């Protein structure tokens, strides 16, 4: 029973010495008494590798590499103390989640936080810390009393009490039946003296700088029981134990504690074995850095070039620079990948970059960062299936489960079934399928949505076929989930719930499907991905086992079980087999324990990262930990103590390699925000005021794109053809615009063009640079296939063509459309308003009610009845689907009511009366009016169809006048510039149709009176507190003033607003200002001469003709217009299709010139005449 301390700075050969000593013992007596080498988890594989591969051993029999937990298993197997069932990480997390729910009423501080996501993990972390430092519920009870006696803060007392409640409940639940991962330590400490194997054992402990209280108790017991204990510690002087600022303070303090234990237990302490001279370093620079790192005023040495610093423009440029340097080291200097390590923090930022960028350079890597299993299909299926049950079949969890592919038949062609599932998803999104709607058969009646015409149109054969497909894939999903729902509805215990979930997975043949996935990955040569499916299955089974262990006989709801299982699934991670190939090691600075490394890259050397900024102190703050320390209870170090350890962690990283050290840092993050370099960078290279460890080291600036550099400086960026190709493309694009290609880049281009493998890739990547983003005209036979022999069009289609021919092609040729969703769209509200006003007009006609004489009460009743009549057949009953939409329904009724009141007031002062409502025109049999026929070239015709909201007429001096009134759910006016360029043709087309078919309603000759817009809305008014009710109504009426364009005819204008006969000035209802002489003001009114109104009609026909000819000629030009600040791309849904880029000098908007209204009328007059 002896203790020996082996000490020394990094690289002095401590581990090498004990390995050689162990090897000598094994060679001299292979079957002698056991030797145990105890190391941290992350060192176990590398230590075994060192002992066998580097010392010529064929295997280990007498010696075993152990972690403390593996030692516990070994001892307890011998002594019989292993009878307890182990609660592993996910079982422990699930148990804590359950206890937090159960004890919520007992909490004084944690009550609100207990159910929040993440809090379980916080509690788990602290309870494990308590376990490591021997703080059980009895100790915590003493802590409570002590804190109360010294009048500690109330918050700390309340927190301690809540922690006591949780810890006591945890201990009661574990009892003598279960043990958690930390619970082995006290059992091992208790059982160690009964293990015969240990009594003659020799123990080596390596890789630790400090021990927790539990570990120290175990080391104490090892000293008492075993024959010999050697502990390897990295420190220089024993006096460093008394200096918190010392580099090796923690390890020296551990040395002091071990000596104290030996003295207390009467253990012999051998003379310390201290190593003074470094053996690791093949570089004078690195040897100098190690020796002088701790010095406040370091001795400066001229660099020999083995320490380099990269200053990168961002993290991506930083990782690219490292990949290039590794490529250089392996190609030109003979290093192997396994000689190189990347050390970093901020794994969440660097892992995706390292993985993707190193793939581009074909550099194999091994990372010890574990990947979560949360996104594996089996885990996602389990979580989403339970969420479906607890969320009433909401859309999101249903289709998360569907996208796992596990509902599809075992031998299914995945591409086909995924497309079917996508169509089902689109249907459910459009129809608002959730909850009981999954089981309401009428909901699954498929027709392509046609607004309010949905119920009146007959289902086509194509729609029937689509319905059959949707129902088939629906049943594949619905039936297993319904079976799960039925089983869970009668489940009462945790075991019942786990069994129901298992049976769902079993019924879907998930195990067989995972095996098929594994086989496909192996066929692709991805052994790592293949292993993940087997790991996921095994871990999923373990989670269910742990759940049943803990809660099998307990009564619980599905909601509660889902939350507990979710905590378990949240802890699952994929493990990776240690590297056996030649791979670059990627490891975190804090956990890495590495040997035989020649080159190290330390990434992300920024301020706040090295040393780390201690922003979060945990569930117990530093101040609260100090209260614990004050009353004699040790816990894990405070953040300030951890900060003191930062120097040692970086020292260990910097002294890891034997040959070369690279320190790299970005100067900006992904958003361009500036980042400062770490103070350790200054320590190495110094600055203007302070000398660094090494002189002559300059931070090498690396950028993402070498175009920022001189041509010679760009050459190092061309280390791999795959990444160099991207840089060449940037150069070629620049050469297109501004400069010739430099000889270096021309040579690179020649390489790609001549290499058999890269030539095809080069041509494919180079194509977008030389190719103009132009759409070629369609051939005649294609236009006929797309648009048919007989072209039928709407005004909105023609307007889309004039906005951008390619946009027209995507909508009407390719028939692209956005995915429909179950929500109230703006255009749908417009349909509702139109239908409501139509219904009111027809209802007043049926009841023989005059709009002029309608009372407010009648208007309110008619508005309510109109909307209520429409709602059941409107947009799949969306206004009945939720309380929010029912509120919107009431708002819509109010809008119709307000608009009706305004329209009745308009009617009171107007001679114009409606003669047609919702007048449809087109080639169909059910249309009220014939189509507007447009003659095209080659003898073809285009037939225009549409629906006119309202046609009004008035008879003045035996002459009839017609006007168009169009209802809009947003404010609108007629811009003659937009008319001229074909962007706004609707109301003038409607006027043309009405004039052409005027004899349907009116005898004799008819004149155009104008076109007007009514804004259907409920206006917000700015009220004065002194305003009367009549003034408020008058102000509201102003908000309904119609906009548009009228014929310059005083008689027809006065007939629209009789009040203008009594007084001059602005009309309250039409866009006219009447002068005192009884004529309208041209400058303050929206009017044109009658003949010009007729010319506008003819001009609009010409625009239709121009568009029709363009469409049939196959025009698909990517030519979006720009008029003032408006462009065709503003609300275009298909920008990703055309890839129009106005920043590219080759692509430009079709610029339309703005002109005054009278200038536009003059231009039209000239063109028509």
Swiss-Prot record:
UniProt record similarity statement: Belongs to the helicase family. AddB/RexB type 1 subfamily.
EC number: 3.1.-.-
Subunit text: Heterodimer of AddA and AddB.
Cofactor note: Binds 1 [4Fe-4S] cluster.
Amino acids binding [4Fe-4S] cluster: 804, 1129, 1132, 1138
Cofactor or coenzyme needed: Mg(2+); [4Fe-4S] cluster
Family matches, as PANTHER family: RECBCD ENZYME SUBUNIT RECC
HAMAP family in the cross-refs: AddB_type1 (MF_01452)
Record protein name field: ATP-dependent helicase/deoxyribonuclease subunit B
Function per UniProt: The heterodimer acts as both an ATP-dependent DNA helicase and an ATP-dependent, dual-direction single-stranded exonuclease. Recognizes the chi site generating a DNA molecule suitable for the initiation of homologous recombination. The AddB subunit has 5' -> 3' nuclease activity but not helicase activity.
Positions with a binding annotation for ATP: 8-15
Residue ranges constituting the UvrD-like helicase ATP-binding domain according to the UniProt record: 1-296
GO biological process: double-strand break repair via homologous recombination
Domain UvrD-like helicase C-terminal: from-to ranges: 276-582
Keywords: 4Fe-4S, ATP-binding, DNA damage, DNA repair, DNA-binding, Exonuclease, Helicase, Hydrolase, Iron, Iron-sulfur, Metal-binding, Nuclease, Nucleotide-binding
Miscellaneous comment text of the record: Despite having conserved helicase domains, this subunit does not have helicase activity.
GO molecular function: 4 iron, 4 sulfur cluster binding; 5'-3' exonuclease activity; ATP binding; double-stranded DNA binding; helicase activity; metal ion binding
Enzyme class: hydrolase
NCBIfam families, sorted: addB_Gpos
Pfam families: ADDB_N (PF21445), PDDEXK_1 (PF12705)
């Amino acid at each position: 029973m002896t203790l020996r301390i082996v000490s020394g700075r990094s690289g002095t050969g401590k581990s090498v010495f004990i390995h050689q000593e162990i090897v000598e013992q094994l060679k001299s007596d292979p079957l002698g008494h056991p030797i145990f080498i105890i190391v941290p988890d992350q060192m176990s594989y590398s230590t075994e590798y060192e002992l066998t591969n580097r010392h010529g051993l064929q295997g280990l029999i007498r010696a075993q590499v152990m972690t403390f937990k593996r030692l516990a298993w070994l001892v307890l197997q011998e002594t019989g103390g292993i009878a307890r069932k182990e609660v592993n990480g996910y079982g422990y997390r699930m148990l804590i989640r359950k206890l937090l729910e159960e004890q919520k009423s007992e909490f004084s501080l944690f009550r609100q936080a207990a159910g929040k996501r993440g809090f379980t993990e916080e509690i788990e972390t602290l309870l494990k810390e308590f376990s490591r430092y021997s703080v059980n519920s009895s100790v915590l009870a003493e802590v409570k009393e002590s804190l109360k006696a010294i009048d500690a803060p109330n918050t700390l007392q309340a927190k301690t009490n809540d922690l006591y409640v949780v810890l006591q409940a945890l201990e009661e639940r574990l009892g003598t039946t279960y043990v958690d991962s930390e619970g082995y330590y006290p059992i091992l400490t208790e059982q160690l003296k009964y293990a015969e194997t240990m009594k003659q054992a020799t123990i080596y402990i390596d890789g630790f700088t400090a021990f927790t209280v539990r570990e120290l108790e175990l080391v104490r017991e090892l000293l008492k029981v075993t024959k010999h204990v050697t502990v390897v510690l990295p420190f220089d002087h024993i006096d460093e134990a008394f200096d918190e600022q010392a580099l090796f303070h923690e390890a020296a303090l551990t040395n002091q504690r071990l000596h104290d234990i030996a003295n207390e237990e009467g253990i012999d302490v051998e003379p310390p074995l201290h190593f003074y001279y470094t053996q690791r370093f093949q570089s004078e620079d690195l040897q100098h850095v190690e020796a002088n790192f701790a010095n406040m005023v370091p001795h400066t040495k001229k660099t020999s070039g083995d320490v380099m610093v990269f200053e990168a423009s961002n993290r991506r440029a930083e990782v690219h620079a490292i990949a290039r340097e590794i490529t250089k080291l392996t190609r030109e200097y003979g290093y192997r990948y396994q000689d190189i390590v990347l050390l970093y923090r901020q794994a969440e930022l660097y892992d995706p970059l390292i993985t993707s960028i190193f793939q581009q350079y074909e550099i194999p890597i091994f990372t010890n960062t574990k990947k979560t299993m949360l996104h594996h299909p089996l885990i996602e299926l389990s979580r989403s299936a339970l969420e479906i049950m607890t969320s009433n079949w909401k859309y999101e969890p249903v289709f998360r489960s569907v996208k796992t592919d596990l509902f599809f038949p075992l031998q299914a062609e995945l591409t086909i079934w995924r497309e079917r599932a996508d169509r089902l998803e689109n249907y459910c999104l459009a129809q608002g399928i959730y909850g009981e709607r999954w089981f309401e058969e009428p909901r699954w009646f498929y027709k392509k949505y046609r607004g309010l015409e949905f119920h009146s149109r007959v289902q086509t054969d194509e729609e029937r076929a689509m319905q059959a497909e949707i129902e088939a894939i629906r049943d594949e999903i619905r039936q297993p989930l319904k079976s799960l729902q039925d089983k869970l509805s009668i489940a009462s215990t945790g075991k019942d719930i786990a069994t129901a979930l298992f049976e769902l997975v079993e019924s879907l043949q998930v195990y067989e499907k995972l095996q098929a996935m594994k086989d496909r990955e192996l066929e692709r040569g991805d052994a790592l991905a293949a292993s993940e499916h087997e790991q996921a299955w095994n871990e999923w089974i373990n989670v269910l086992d742990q759940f049943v262990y803990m809660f099998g006989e307990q009564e619980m709801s599905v909601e509660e079980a889902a939350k507990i299982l979710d905590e378990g699934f949240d802890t699952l991670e994929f493990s990776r087999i240690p590297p056996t190939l030649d791979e670059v090691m990627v490891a975190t600075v804090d956990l890495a324990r590495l040997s035989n490394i020649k080159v190290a890259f330390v990434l992300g050397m920024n301020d706040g990262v090295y040393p780390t900024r201690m922003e979060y102190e945990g569930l117990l703050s530093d101040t609260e930990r100090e209260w614990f320390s004050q009353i004699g209870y040790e816990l894990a170090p405070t953040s300030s103590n951890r900060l003191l350890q930062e120097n040692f962690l970086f020292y260990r990283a910097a002294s890891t390699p034997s040959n070369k050290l690279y320190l790299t840092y970005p100067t900006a993050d992904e958003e361009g925000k500036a980042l400062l370099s770490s103070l350790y960078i200054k320590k190495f290279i110094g600055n203007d005021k302070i000398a660094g460890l090494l002189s002559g080291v300059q931070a090498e600036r690396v950028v993402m794109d070498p175009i920022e550099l001189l041509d010679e400086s760009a050459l190092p960026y061309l280390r791999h053809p795959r990444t160099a190709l991207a840089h060449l493309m940037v150069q070629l694009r620049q050469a297109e615009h501004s400069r010739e290609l430099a000889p270096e880049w021309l040579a690179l281009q020649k390489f790609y063009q001549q290499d058999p493998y890269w030539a095809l890739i080069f041509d494919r990547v180079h194509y977008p640079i030389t190719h103009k983003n132009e759409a070629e005209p369609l051939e005649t036979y294609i236009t006929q296939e797309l648009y048919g022999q007989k072209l039928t069009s709407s005004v909105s289609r023609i307007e889309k063509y004039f906005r951008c021919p390619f946009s027209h092609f995507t909508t009407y040729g390719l028939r692209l459309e956005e995915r429909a969703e179950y929500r109230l769209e703006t255009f749908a509200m417009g349909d509702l308003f139109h239908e409501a006003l139509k219904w009111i007009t027809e209802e007043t006609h049926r009841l023989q009610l005059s709009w002029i004489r309608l009372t407010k009460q009648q208007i309110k009743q008619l508005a309510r009845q109109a909307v209520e009549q429409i709602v059941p057949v409107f947009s799949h009953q969306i206004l009945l689907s939720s309380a929010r939409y029912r509120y919107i329904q009431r708002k819509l009724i109010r809008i119709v009511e307000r608009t009706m009141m305004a329209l009745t007031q308009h009617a009171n002062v107007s001679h114009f009366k409606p003669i047609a409502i919702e007048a449809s025109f087109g080639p169909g049999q059910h249309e009220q009016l014939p189509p507007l026929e447009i003659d095209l070239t080659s003898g073809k015709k285009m037939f225009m169809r549409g629906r006119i909201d309202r046609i009004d007429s008035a008879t003045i001096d035996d002459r009839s006048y017609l006007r168009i009134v169009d209802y809009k759910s947003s404010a609108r006016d007629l811009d003659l510039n937009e008319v001229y360029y074909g962007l706004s043709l609707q109301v003038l087309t409607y006027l043309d149709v009405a004039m052409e078919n005027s004899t349907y309603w009116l005898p004799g000759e008819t004149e155009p009176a104008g076109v007007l817009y009514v804004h259907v809305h409920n206006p917000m008014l700015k009220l004065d507190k002194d305003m009367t009710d009549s003034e408020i109504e008058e102000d509201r009426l102003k908000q309904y003033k119609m906009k548009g364009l009228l014929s310059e005819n005083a008689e027809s204008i006065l007939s629209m607003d009789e009040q203008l006969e009594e007084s001059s000035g602005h009309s309250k209802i039409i866009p006219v200002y009447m002068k005192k002489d009884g004529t309208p003001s041209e400058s303050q009114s929206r009017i044109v001469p009658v003949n010009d109104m007729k010319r506008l009609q003819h001009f609009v026909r010409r625009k239709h003709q121009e568009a029709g000819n363009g469409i049939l000629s196959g025009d698909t030009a990517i030519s979006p217009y720009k008029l003032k600040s408006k462009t065709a791309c503003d609300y275009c849904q298909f920008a990703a299709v055309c890839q129009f880029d106005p920043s590219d000098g080759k692509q430009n908007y079709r610029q339309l010139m703005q002109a005054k209204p009278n200038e536009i009328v003059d231009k039209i007059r000239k063109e028509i005449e």
